[in-house]
Amino acid sequence: MDRLKLEGVGMTSKRTRDRLVERLLEQGVTSQFVLELIANTPRHLFLDEALSHRAYEDASLPIGFGQTLSQPYIVARMTEILLGAAGDPKRVLEIGTGSGYQTCILAQAVEHVWSVERIKPLQDKAKQRLRHLGLNNVTYKHADGGFGWPEQGPFDAILSAAAPRDIPKSLLQQLAHNGVLVIPVGADEQVLTLVIRDGEEDKFITQKLEPVKFVPLLSGVTR
C-alpha cells in the first residue's frame, strides 16, 4: 500500500470531511480504517472544477462519457466488504478506473492494484491524479473490463465499478483460491454481490448484499 503525498494539494476543511464521515457512520459503514481513508482522500481532485464544490456530498456525480464518480457511501461500503471478506489482500483487480477515486482508496489499502478501463481519456486523467498524489502501486490497462486481466491473475480480490447483467465467468476464473469478488449485478434492478472462491472445494459462494445503482458494464473500448 502507498501513502498519499498531500503537499501542495488543497484540502477542504476538516469539518466538511468529518461531516461526510458522520453520514457514512449513520449509513452503517463501521471500518475505522476505511472511514479514515475516505476522510483523508481529497475527493474534489477527482472531479472537474465546475463540480468540485459538491465533492463531499454523499452523491454520485458525472465525470463525462456517461460515467459517474460513485457516491462515497458506495466506495466505502465496497472497500469495507472487500477488505473484510478477503482479509489482507495483496493483489487487487479493479474493473472500471473511472475518475480514479476508488482506485486511490484501494491503493492506500492493498499492496498493488491492477485497474482496467475501457474509456481512455478517463483513465489518462485518473493516472495523472494518482501520480500527483504519489501513488505508484497501480498498473493500468485500457481494455474491455469484462475480460478482466488474465495475464496478471490470479487476484486476491476483484472489485467492479460497473454492473454486468450476469457475473462474467472470466472474472471468477481470475480469483485466487479464497479470493473475493465484489460486484453490482443486474440491469434495471441491481444488487451488490459478494462472491467467495472456496479454496478447498473450488466452488463459488455467492451472497446478495443490498440494492445499488451503477452504470452498466459495457463491452468494447473508447479511445
From Swiss-Prot:
Name this polypeptide is given: Protein-L-isoaspartate O-methyltransferase
Predominant subcellular localization, coarse grouping: cytoplasm
Role played: Catalyzes the methyl esterification of L-isoaspartyl residues in peptides and proteins that result from spontaneous decomposition of normal L-aspartyl and L-asparaginyl residues. It plays a role in the repair and/or degradation of damaged proteins.
HAMAP family for this protein: PIMT
GO (cellular component) term, any one: cytoplasm
Keyword annotations: Cytoplasm, Methyltransferase, S-adenosyl-L-methionine, Transferase
Entry's Gene Ontology molecular function annotations: protein-L-isoaspartate (D-aspartate) O-methyltransferase activity
